[in-house]
Amino acid sequence: MYDRYESPLSSRYASPEMLKLFSMETRIQTWRKLWVALAKAEMELGLPITEEQVQQLEEQVENIDFACAAAREKEVRHDVMAHVYTYGKVAPKAAGIIHLGATSCYVTDNGDLILYRDALLHLRKGLLAVMQNLAAFAKQYRALPTLGYTHYQPAQLVTVGKRATLWLQDFLMDLEELDFVLEHMKFLGCRGTTGTEASFLDLFGGDTEKIDEMNRRIGKTFGFSECYDVCGQTYPRKLDSRILQCLSAIGQSCYRMANDIRLLQHDRQIEEPFEKNQIGSSAMAYKRNPMRCERICSLSRYLMADAANAPMTASVQWLERTLDDSANRRISMPEGFLCADAVLRLAQNVTDGLHVNEKIVAKTVREYLPFIATENLLMEAVKRGGDRQELHEVIRRCSMEATARMKEGESCDLLERLAAEPAFQLNGQDLEKLLKPEDYIGRCPEQVDAFVEKVTPLFKNLKQEKTEINV
């Protein structure tokens, strides 16, 4: 185990469920189930295949001799034929009818479609879990004022909950895209070497209705209601591009959220979970590094970059197909799913344990609120008979002086400066009345309530389990 390379996605980051789904065992069992479905459909539609042969195939689906398959593949240099041979060894009565009329892509491509569909459904649950956590967080802090930033510079007030809805909305868009991909996935079926189904015309004596019915039955067995109308030897590789772009979008949303949390943790406003015995630094014992969010960003970069593989593969299919897609897809597709799974697991863990330091949030608001409130102060002073242009200049001058003082490490004294200006005709009490943070958050609470209400039905049947991360 320690003398050969192992992908960190499998050893450190991805879930046991996703690792099982993309294991060689699941892959070959899926191939065998496809061979069973083919033989059964051919038998039911009149080809000379017996129930005994189909039964023996069904009984041996999980009895896989991987050593035998590896030895055979070394000899014949063909993975599918190696497994046809190995399957026939344990189901000798059916050995002669395995893979009848099919080409390799019958099992490889349909098998991938099944695995990708199941993997997307698994990711969907993780995505919904993150969204549910964020919805609860947004609702909890719907009205807590916090300093908003544009260009990462202090702007107007928002609320902690409203900011979380921005992350939530990104994930909602990802969910919509994922559902679109799932809804439009189709089965390849058993279409022959160039998609013409010529071999089945011979097998079924030219009966095209039987060919269509065979494909319908096989697709239905695996939960697909449609096959692609036309194809070459493979299913359209545009689907791979669509899938990886969907996973990339999830990475983009996770990266954005995690990066925001990292910025806020720097200011000690919000912190990701930190375990009791967790060590932040080998040298600086006091450190509380945002390790989870940093890892989300790191893995998300890989996920976004991985998506570039599929468009290049889809663009070089060469007429009815070429094999130069194979090696790339063996890596880029499973790794994309494993990476998306890892990122969502981390995002679920982080959003389940986000901690808001409300006193620091309030302190930051108090520090900048005098600047934010200057427009309101200006309007109030004008109502009391002041000159708008003169007052604007006073605010500008006092703001610059207060800012210069803050750059020297002193506290903000803008209010005191304005109260001392005769042009304002406002005393300290008047100014304090105009400095209620809740008066500067606009419709944030209302917006949070409306958006959370919109997404809540999505969580109706969600059974969320606490996510543990390995390291």
Regions found by a protein language model. Give the residues of each.
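Short, well-ordered beta-strand elements within core beta-sheets of diverse protein domains
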Residues: K162, S241-A249, N376-R384
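Active-site-adjacent "gating/activation" loops or surface patches in catalytic cores
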Residues: T208-Q233
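Glycine-rich cofactor-pocket loops
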Residues: K139-G161, E271-K287, E320-A327, D352-I372
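Active/binding-pocket-proximal capping segment
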Residues: E271, E393-E401
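A conserved active-site cap/scaffold subdomain adjacent to cofactor or substrate pockets
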Residues: T234-Q269, Q278-C339
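Alpha-helical transition-metal enzyme core signature, strongest for iron centers
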Residues: R77-V80, L127, M131-L134, A164-L178, ...
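A helix-coil-helix interface module used to build multimeric assemblies
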Residues: M1-D202, G206-R217, G280-S281, M291-R295, ...
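Long, amphipathic alpha-helical stalk/connector segments used for oligomerization, subunit docking
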Residues: Y302-R388, V394
